[in-house]
Amino acid sequence: MKPDIKICGLKTPEAIDRALERGATHIGFIFFEKSPRYIEPDLAGKLAEPARGKAKIVAVVVDPSNDELDEIVSLLKPDILQLHGNESPEHVLTIKALYGLPVMKVFSVRTADDLKRVEAYIGIADRFLFDAKAPKGSELPGGNGISFDWSLLSWLDGSIDYMLSGGLNKDNVADALVKTKARGIDVSSGVETAPGVKSVAMIDEFFDAVEEADAPVMASGS
């Protein structure tokens, strides 16, 4: 089965159009000001218009204030809130109640210990996203172009819905899909020529790689 594909950190209509043309199921906008992929909520709302009804619009936030969330939800009208900070299970429930939106909770992973917190969010977050933990000195919680040991996710059974992120690109995405039970994949730096600069050609290459990886599965099931 073809995975959900999220292109994150979008800032231009050209990249959004190509992502939609290639079948992206989710498009992500980043509202973390230190990120080179940061976008103002009003601009994100305008850029997201062609995607409505075609792909899920995801607002990516890091420990946001209520005022920040109010503005983002009002201007972007997202389908999903992606929480990439240290939000507690209680805070996740509060955010879901305030905005009536599903939440994708991100966990940054380097070792098995980083996954111990997941259990507390089962039944609270609507979906998980596992990303590589930022290297020392980085101010960015994600989008650093590094991967983690995917075997750390082997204990997760099929009942836990998650997306895989962290250093995915055209060269490793097929391997990632084989080695994990991820129902979705998330790419940002893997389709960029420079931080925050999406490449239409690299978006094409990424989708080509996913389709090639999926083809044997489809053939064997036919």
UniProtKB/Swiss-Prot annotation:
Any one Pfam family match given in the protein's UniProt record, by short name: PRAI
Keyword DNA-binding: no
GO MF annotation: an example: phosphoribosylanthranilate isomerase activity
Gene3D superfamilies per UniProt: Aldolase class I (3.20.20.70)
Pathway per the UniProt entry: Amino-acid biosynthesis; L-tryptophan biosynthesis; L-tryptophan from chorismate: step 3/5
Keyword Cytoplasm in annotation: no
Keywords: Amino-acid biosynthesis, Aromatic amino acid biosynthesis, Isomerase, Tryptophan biosynthesis
EC number, UniProt record: 5.3.1.24
Entry-linked InterPro entries: Aldolase_TIM, PRAI_dom, RibuloseP-bd_barrel, TrpF_fam
Catalytic activity annotation: N-(5-phospho-beta-D-ribosyl)anthranilate = 1-(2-carboxyphenylamino)-1-deoxy-D-ribulose 5-phosphate
Gene Ontology biological process terms from the UniProt entry: L-tryptophan biosynthetic process
Family of the protein in this entry: Belongs to the TrpF family.
HAMAP family noted in UniProt: PRAI
Protein name: N-(5'-phosphoribosyl)anthranilate isomerase
Source organism: Rhizobium leguminosarum bv. trifolii (strain WSM2304)
Organism ancestry: Bacteria, Pseudomonadati, Pseudomonadota, Alphaproteobacteria, Hyphomicrobiales
